[in-house]
Amino acid sequence: MVDLRQNFGISFRELELAVFQKMQEMFVTVMQDVLKELDAAVFRLRKKSRYQVKEVRSGCVATLMGDVEYKRRYYLDKETGEYVFLLDKALDVEAGRVSPGLAIAAAMQAVLGPSYRAARESLKRLYGYQVVSHETIRQLILRLGELIEKEEEKKREEAAGTRKVPVLFVEVDGYWLSMQKGKKRRQEMRMMVAHEGWEARTPSSKEYELVHKTHYLDLDSKDFWEKASRHLYSRYDIDENTMVVINGDRASWIRKGVEYFPNAIYQVDRFHIKRDLRRLLLGTRELKVCLEAADRSDLKTLTSSLAQARDRAKTRIDDLSQFAQIDELLKSIRQMPEAYIDYRVRLAGKGYDVSKMRGMGAAESNVDRFSNRLKKRGQSWSVQGLKAMVQSLVKYFEGKLEHYSKHTSRIHDLLDGAEITKKAVGVARQITSEITGVKQTNVPIMHAGTTRSGGLSRLFHTLSRDRLLTT
């Protein structure tokens, strides 16, 4: 058997790489021919009275299978006086940039990985060569963030949501990030996670997930609630019949959220209450009593036990700091006692059915998801870079990143004839079929899963569905 392998003179890995390289060469050739035919189609179907050909220019686009150099016509737009590549516009790609397919893969790797360099190396390991530079990936995320922010800002300005829900859950938290420049070397990222409740992951599952979850994150501390509330108003029809439950720690800026909705209540997050009790009462006999009282929303027992612990700490010089902190917590409970009562108890008293409602606290886990990419790996950020990454992460966690990564323009404003899309796809199919001669194709990465494949599995499924690949 060893002799047989030696006679081949090649290992499976070497064979795999050799075949893959040939596929890359074939892909580039096919793409060049397809682009040539599509440019000819654009030339035939353009608005001839508007677009005049001036010359033919070369371009290059980075794709999943390598750089594709191609030539296309350069037009004068007689209406605007500007020059334009109609093919690039029609395909929503610019020479010198990355293809939509590579954009999806790069964006996925950028938000999942620890850094842009790690994203570059991940793609390099997958394809066997450097597909794209880390700076190109960074620029991609910046453009992606700008695109998302413009769309979200437009929605906030309109603020005409139509979805109606009886109860809207709003969970808020903040965390600090390291910045690269400016007077503030650390800035607080404020985050809102809103949802409509909980549902089991599967019919028999004991694990739950949030229903219609949406995020809003901002570095602008002054206008946080103004923008965050409009984010919700752009999605929901919120009126006096909509109960908005705001959950968060004892920070004063979180409590202000109730002022932005007609009917809202604020609850101090149960996790934060218990964390403070454990920290302040560690080693005291009041700890267990206070924890149990907090679970029952028994404020009378909670405050009396806290008072006992505070008074005892006051008598010891080494516990004066503890005394002050317990006293501050006690004053907070007495000033806004309703905020320390479980929201379900309060809603039940108002006639709401709370049987399917669960304890709140999603903001804490979502902070971990975001901070894992933004702060736990030692990064420091520019304001622009941070905002772009945050927008990309939001869309990733909401399952919408791929949509924005492959964002396409409308070509009907540029070309005559609604049949252009159908004809373009037909040309692509015909050329691909003629050059490759492939009748049956099975691409393993189609079955690798979206996260594992960096979004490529969904891309290949789309190609298969459109019959660009026959499986």
Where is each model-derived feature located?
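Catalytic center-proximal scaffold of phosphoryl-transfer enzymes
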Residues: 1-32, 74-471
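N-terminal "assembly arms/tails" that initiate or stabilize quaternary assembly
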Residues: 26-44
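N-terminal juxtadomain amphipathic helix
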Residues: 42-73
